[in-house]
Amino acid sequence: IWPWKCKDALFRYNEAADTRLNQDGMAYDADSGDGTLYEYNYSSQNEGGCVMFCLEEAIHNTFRYNVSVDDLGGILSPSGNPDAYVAENEFYVRRGVPLLRNQMSDGRITLEKNKITMIENENGGQR
């Protein structure tokens, strides 16, 4: 669910699952947006990860109160953005999947009060 060059876009109570990788392929992407807010959303098994903040025009974006289960490839991707706020989310992460994506993670991000739980397998079995 990706807005592009939007001002104050709001995404609430959505589900994104099983997206496939094509350079990115995450559930959510504040792509060059100003003030995008994602809250109370659910994502699972997206090959590109959970959320991306894309390019230097991606400013003042917030990702809060969301649940990510078994997203892959790196959960967060701050890609060239000057700021992003990620707070009070629940991330259920498979062993070996990094919190920050290995590629496209050269932006800035502030993390606050997020819950990260390691899971054993794709079915969500806890370790």
What are these regions (language model features)?
Residues G25-D29, V51-C54, I75-S77:
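Solvent-exposed loop and edge beta-strand segments that line ligand/cofactor-binding
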Residues A58-I59, R101:
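Hydrophobic alpha-helical segments
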Residues W2, K7-R20, M26-A27, D34-G49, ...:
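Right-handed parallel beta-helix
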Residues E120, G125-R127:
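C-terminal structured "cap/appendage" subdomains that terminate the fold
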